[in-house]
Amino acid sequence: MSEPHFKVIIVGGSITGLTLAHSLHKIGVDFTILEKRATVTPQEGASVGILPNGARVLDQLGLYGLVEEATAPLGATHIHFPDGFHFCSLYPKSMLDNFGYPVAFLERRRLLEVLYNALPDKSKVLVNKTVSDIEQCEDGKSAGVKVRTADGDVYEGDIVVGADGVHSRTRSELWRMSSSAGQSEDVRMEKARMSAEYSCVFGISRGPSGLKAGEQIMRMYDGRTLVVIPSKDDVVFWFLSRKLGKKYKYSEAPRFTLEDAAAECAELADAPLGNDVRFGDVWKIRQTFNMVVLEENLLRTWSFGRVLCIGDSIHKMTVNLGQGANCAIEDVAILTNLLSQCLGSKREAKPSGQELDALLRRFNDVHLSRVSHIYDTSWLIARVHARDGFVRKIIGRYVMPYFGHKFESRPFNMIANAAALEFLPLPRSSFPGWEKYKSKEDKSGSWAVVSRSVLLLVGLAILSTWWRRA
């Protein structure tokens, strides 16, 4: 009697979870998605940015065409400072020219619709399924995982992948099992890494705004950043991030109401956006909005036995760099590649629990260095945009406008070195950036080099002033 098919239980019908489902289908792996909400396409007022590294994987899966149709590609970013200075960056156009994919923003709900509607078998997506606990077993033929839901149902598979976001239930179960195995101190350290220093009001407005589609506006204030992204069909995406009064532990992070969000936006109602348009005008045509705390975490251990977490559950970033969803899509690519290699070599029998534990640890080892680089860059960019500290103000005001093009290769390295699905053709690979910037990624923290350079320049300027006065 032949072995039953290998099966993955995916917790979370998120962008990450649905993309994983498509990838698993491509290699013939069965799956079930357990989503706690009543729908996989909720309206939460959020947009999502798809950059070339995420776009390429979606393109490999045959999904990017619908994403592209829903967006107006960014061609420029207009950046404004408190002293009235502003400049225009053509970085978004340069990214398109180099990689063949634009910086594209669309409604998060629309992307979820694209991913869900394209699934070959939607019966594998189950809603109103809140995970209560996960059990692992290595007892002969019954080896595998059991996932219990709050309604009493049990779902069996070979591995569990938590794609259930920053408030991950899967992560909690992973930590519970790790603690039971004598790793309580490691779990304590992981929990301590989770914090929040920023809040964000994000929203979607609809109607004539007077703003040009594809031209992003960013206004940088001390402790705040306002970003407005006019898109096609008179849709405007926007977000307002703000540094909180202190750094919060994840478990103590504040919650916000819609009244809090409205008050936050009212403070910047007079912020000019160009063409005699102010942020208050965009606010007046709002369709939906929300306010959340922006958690930040980069965990070091992503798996235990047959249980793995991916996406925001292990690497949550601020919104400024726009790599959150794209990094999660890369998680999917690397995991699917490893599963494809492992299952292809097994032929008749399934991998043992020991082999799967090693595979998931391998995923962690392979990907952690790159994710760390992206996370560190995102961490710094958020603080440069918020003018948080003297050196970061100097970087934003004087380095970015005049020397930003010199550092353009840094984010391009990040794109070119991205993971893709190894078993599918690479679309748009003829664009020069994929080869030009590949394998030149500076994982030592290129922006740290910029910071040190700025400090040196400031120090020399102070010494020069002192010398002239002496």
Curated annotation (Swiss-Prot):
Pathway it works in: Secondary metabolite biosynthesis; terpenoid biosynthesis
Main location: membrane
Signal peptide range: 1-24
UniProt-listed InterPro entries: FAD-bd, FAD/NAD-bd_sf, FAD_mOase_fung
One Pfam family, short name: FAD_binding_3
Localization per record: Membrane
Membrane-spanning parts: 447-463
Cofactors (names): FAD
Keywords from the named record: FAD, Flavoprotein, Glycoprotein, Membrane, Monooxygenase, Oxidoreductase, Signal, Transmembrane, Transmembrane helix
Glycan-bearing residues: 128
GO cellular component terms, semicolon-separated: membrane
Active site: 193
Keyword DNA-binding found: no
BP GO annotations: terpenoid biosynthetic process
Superkingdom, natural source: Eukaryota
Binding site for FAD: 35, 49, 108, 312, 325
Uses described in the biotechnology field: Diterpenoid pyrones display various biological activities and higginsianin A shows anti-HIV activity.
Gene Ontology MF term list: FAD binding; monooxygenase activity
Membrane topology summary: Single-pass membrane protein
EC code: 1.-.-.-
Reported function: FAD-dependent monooxygenase; part of the gene cluster that mediates the biosynthesis of the diterpenoid pyrones higginsianins A and B. The first step of the pathway is the synthesis of the alpha-pyrone moiety by the polyketide synthase dpchA via condensation of one acetyl-CoA starter unit with 3 malonyl-CoA units and 2 methylations. The alpha-pyrone is then combined with geranylgeranyl pyrophosphate (GGPP) formed by the GGPP synthase dpchD through the action of the prenyltransferase dpchC to yield a linear alpha-pyrone diterpenoid.
Family: Belongs to the paxM FAD-dependent monooxygenase family.
Descriptive protein name: FAD-dependent monooxygenase dpchE
Organism: Colletotrichum higginsianum (strain IMI 349063) (Crucifer anthracnose fungus)
Highest classification ranks of the organism: Eukaryota, Fungi, Dikarya, Ascomycota, Pezizomycotina
Gene, per the UniProt record: dpchE
